[in-house]
Swiss-Prot record:
SUPFAM superfamilies documented for this protein: Bet v1-like
Organism for this UniProt entry: Prunus armeniaca
PANTHER family reported in the protein's UniProt record: OS08G0374000 PROTEIN-RELATED (PTHR31213), STRESS-INDUCED PROTEIN SAM22 (PTHR31213:SF55)
Highest taxon of the lineage: Eukaryota
One biological process term in Gene Ontology: abscisic acid-activated signaling pathway
Protein's name according to its UniProt entry: Major allergen Pru ar 1
Stated family: Belongs to the BetVI family.
Keywords tagged on the record: Allergen, Pathogenesis-related protein, Plant defense
GO molecular function, one term: protein phosphatase inhibitor activity
Gene Ontology CC entries for this record: cytoplasm; nucleus
Length: 160
């Protein structure tokens, strides 16, 4: 099995604590609300939402995928970090065993946020994942992120 790691950064005008509450802690409710064609809903299959929880995300009509299951690996509300692993679903394809994500929010000098994401693609066999193959996923994640940011800007009292 090979492991390929990719890093991404997004910036936001939203302070990190507020963005963490919305984009991480309440994502199961907020993302289907702001992007219903992308994500239909999220269901907890095992656990209480904390570490070890297994969630099933069902994608909307606008997605090329039907669903994914992921396991929550870590939540650190004090340090604004979250980690999870995609463990099942048609987004994994036949060459990817799983994808582990580490997300960290930090304050930017202008009072907004820098969202740092590290993705670890664990492949089956010696398959190599190319940057182009993950680009579409990164663009969709950036699109969801911008929808959440727009919601927070339009609703300044939300998630205070």
């Amino acid at each position: 099995m090979g492991v390929f790691t990719y890093e991404t950064e997004f910036t936001s005008v939203i302070p990190p604590e507020k963005l963490f509450k919305a984009f991480i802690l309440d994502a199961d409710n907020l993302i289907p609300k702001v992007a219903p064609t992308a994500v239909k809903g999220t269901e907890i299959l095992e656990g209480d939402g904390g570490v070890g929880t297994i969630k099933k995300v069902t994608f909307g009509e606008g997605s090329q995928y039907a669903y994914v299951k992921h396991r929550v690996d870590g939540i650190d509300k004090d340090n604004l970090s979250y980690s999870y692993t995609l463990i099942e679903g048609d987004a994994l394809s036949d060459v990817i065993e799983n994808i582990a994500y580490d997300i960290k929010l930090v304050a930017s000098p202008d009072g907004g946020s820098i969202v740092k994401t590290t993705s670890h693609y664990h492949t089956k066999g010696d398959v190599e994942i190319k940057e182009e193959q993950v680009k579409a996923g990164k663009e969709k994640a950036a699109g969801l992120f911008k929808l959440v940011e727009a919601y927070l800007l339009a609703n300044p009292d939300a998630y205070n």
